[in-house]
Amino acid sequence: MTNELVYEGKAKQLFKTEEAGVLRVAYKDDATALNGVRKESFAGKGELNNQITALIFSYLEEAGIRSHFIRAISETEQLVKEVSIIPLEVVVRNVIAGSLAKRLGKEEGEEIPSAIVEFYYKEDALDDPFINDDHVLYLEIATTNEMEVIRKAARSINEVLQVLFNQMNITLIDFKLEFGRDADGNILLADEISPDTCRLWDKETKQKLDKDVFRRNIGNLTDVYTEVLNRLKQVQN
């Protein structure tokens, strides 16, 4: 196992492995908000997100969704296929919440009849601005065909995840996806899917089971992430 660091983000580190085209992802215990302006560490968070992501990516693979995920190799680590990350954050929204409530002047909790798919330019220096297809083409982030592939994949992932979270008695409010190109140019789902990247509300109590408990100081982050993992394990057993 090599310790050559390839990339370090807010919540993960990527390392080279002895196998070409395969990277080792190490999940960190750090939690950030406001694009990294606020930062704290929570013991066990990395382990929780690693396990949750591994279970969800495996579930998506069974549903025919291709991703970079290979397998978990420890409590906090997993192996992934090396991809070139497309600098787009793809946000799928099923219920009004967060920035969308402010932008549209709507109340949080209002259901959206048909899921909204949004693109954000993945650039910390610009605070990840909301962009449209024309911006994507102008910035040469992706082609028209690639955007179609990404948008279709995002909607398919949403359909599959809603079934899963409904079984967990959780409403999938919205979530962020990232995609990458493999060595052959195929577009694969990448990054992670966890309470760091999703808004999750308990269907009955409306309790927030995601990073909003940290953003808004309304609960214990590791407690709610543990609750999500436990429910996920229950429905997959």
UniProtKB/Swiss-Prot annotation:
Keywords: ATP-binding, Ligase, Nucleotide-binding, Purine biosynthesis. It catalyses: 5-amino-1-(5-phospho-D-ribosyl)imidazole-4-carboxylate + L-aspartate + ATP = (2S)-2-[5-amino-1-(5-phospho-beta-D-ribosyl)imidazole-4-carboxamido]succinate + ADP + phosphate + 2 H(+). It comes from the Bacteria. Pfam families: SAICAR_synt. InterPro entries: SAICAR_synt/ADE2_N, SAICAR_synt_PurC, SAICAR_synth, SAICAR_synthetase, SAICAR_synthetase_CS. One of its GO terms (biological process) is cobalamin biosynthetic process. Pathway: Purine metabolism; IMP biosynthesis via de novo pathway; 5-amino-1-(5-phospho-D-ribosyl)imidazole-4-carboxamide from 5-amino-1-(5-phospho-D-ribosyl)imidazole-4-carboxylate: step 1/2. Its EC number is 6.3.2.6. SUPFAM superfamilies: SAICAR synthase-like (SSF56104). The keyword Nucleotide-binding applies. The keyword Metal-binding does not apply. This is Phosphoribosylaminoimidazole-succinocarboxamide synthase. It comes from Listeria welshimeri serovar 6b (strain ATCC 35897 / DSM 20650 / CCUG 15529 / CIP 8149 / NCTC 11857 / SLCC 5334 / V8). The gene is purC.
